[in-house]
């Protein structure tokens, strides 16, 4: 690194890097000039005397800042703490935009109520704490939230909404008989397929009322079928044979791949029924899930189905030594599913790669006396810091 004495045109010049362009399939040699924390010029052979500081990139790859479109902050630590630590992790991995899924209910701020009161608190706790650009997707959990969709778009700029399809009988970590308490919704509320339909109708009504924003307004779905998961969890837990499945293999079997595929079918038909064309199918983890999504794209060509994949589902399989530390929803899958996900990604059948970052410290993830027990582990792990390096 060197410093120039004369009046500079640029604050920083990074010389001799191989630049990666979005949507490109080749890299090219260039220099990058920066002024006022913004890229001012990308070109070969920029004169070093025009910069206050010159840094030799020595042939390293230079990427644009990464958008991690699927993160979670504030689940296992207070939001005001996670905003700092997890955005630092994002920046360390080259992520410069963090889009976080948020909801009312247990975890997060651990309270229910309307978003008109809840979301300003989220923004207040976040302000000045993130080290990268950030935004939020929100999940309408009850009728009031559906009614608030236009307000959330117009007043707060929220354009993406979410449905957790498996919350019908499952909580964050496994089966649950107290869903209303977990979700913190009223006695007359149900978080079920009918609610999913009404969320879609609410999102589409907002799109129609705001045609200038319609392209940006979308709905994301975590596609797993609660009833299938409940039944298969009982089957797996009931098996006491010497050869019974354990660890990540058991958890994968308890939330089988066809549970994802069936949920994709349901989500797709509801999107068709409600005329909602902007659908994001979040983190399919298996061949069956992706194939179901591709089939639905053919059946309903008027719907723009986006398909994402997490870096965890590309890097890990059920044989991972991480064991219960890799518990996540949807589960880590067998190797054949992982290989298929890579094939689908390289074939352009998956639209973006995300982390689904939900940092959970090891002592919280699974206490020592539960080591080896996948059912007692909490779900989720970090990942935004290795999103780009792993690829």
PLM features: residue spans?
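Metal-associated gating/positioning segment near the N- to mid-region
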Residues: 49, 57-129
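Short beta-alpha connecting loops at secondary-structure transitions
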Residues: 326, 371-378
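Active-site mouth loops of central-metabolism enzymes
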Residues: 69-81, 109, 132-145, 252-258
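Short, acidic/polar
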Residues: 79-87, 143-152, 266
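Histidine/acidic residue-rich metal-binding segments in metalloenzymes
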Residues: 147-353, 358-361, 369
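Histidine-rich, glycine-flanked metal-binding segment
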Residues: 2-63
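Divalent metal-coordination and catalytic microenvironments
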Residues: 17, 32, 37, 59, ...
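Short catalytic-loop micro-motif centered on adjacent basic/acidic residues
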Residues: 100, 135-138, 278-283
């Amino acid at each position: 690194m060197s410093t120039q004495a004369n009046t500079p045109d640029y604050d920083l010049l990074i010389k001799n890097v191989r630049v990666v362009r979005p949507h490109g399939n080749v890299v090219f040699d260039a220099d990058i000039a920066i002024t006022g924390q913004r890229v001012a010029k990308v070109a070969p052979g920029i004169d070093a005397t025009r910069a206050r500081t010159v840094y030799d990139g020595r042939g390293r790859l230079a990427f644009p800042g990464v958008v991690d479109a699927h993160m979670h902050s504030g689940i296992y630590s207070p939001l005001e703490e996670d905003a700092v630590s997890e955005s630092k992790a994002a920046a360390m991995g080259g992520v410069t935009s963090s889009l976080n899924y948020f909801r009312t209910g247990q975890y997060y701020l651990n309270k229910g109520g309307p978003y008109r009161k809840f979301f300003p608190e989220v923004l207040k706790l976040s302000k000045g704490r993130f080290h990268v650009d950030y935004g939020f997707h929100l999940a309408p959990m009850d009728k009031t939230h559906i009614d608030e969709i236009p307000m959330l778009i117009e007043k707060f700029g929220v354009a993406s909404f979410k449905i957790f399809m498996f919350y019908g009988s499952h909580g964050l970590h496994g089966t649950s008989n107290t869903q209303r308490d977990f979700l913190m919704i009223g006695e007359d509320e149900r978080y079920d397929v009918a609610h999913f339909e009404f969320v879609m109708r609410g999102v589409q009504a907002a799109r129609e009322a705001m045609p200038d924003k319609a392209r940006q307004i979308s709905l994301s779905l975590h596609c797993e079928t609660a009833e299938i998961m409940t039944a298969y969890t009982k089957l797996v837990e009931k098996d006491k044979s010497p050869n019974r499945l354990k660890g990540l293999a058991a958890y994968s079997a308890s939330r089988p791949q066809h549970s994802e595929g069936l949920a994709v079918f349901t989500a797709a038909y509801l999107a068709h029924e409600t005329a909602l064309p902007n659908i994001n199918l979040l983190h399919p983890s298996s061949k069956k899930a992706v194939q179901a999504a591709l089939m639905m794209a053919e059946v309903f060509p008027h719907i723009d189905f986006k398909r994402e994949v997490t870096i965890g589902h590309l890097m890990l399989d059920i044989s991972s030594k991480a064991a219960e530390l890799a518990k996540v929803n949807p589960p880590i899958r067998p190797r054949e599913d992982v290989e298929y996900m890579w094939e689908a990604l390289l074939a352009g059948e998956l639209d973006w790669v995300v982390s689904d970052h939900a940092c959970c410290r090891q002592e919280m993830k699974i206490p020592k006396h539960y080591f080896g027990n996948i059912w007692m582990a909490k779900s989720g792990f970090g990942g935004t810091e290795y999103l780009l390096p792993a690829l």
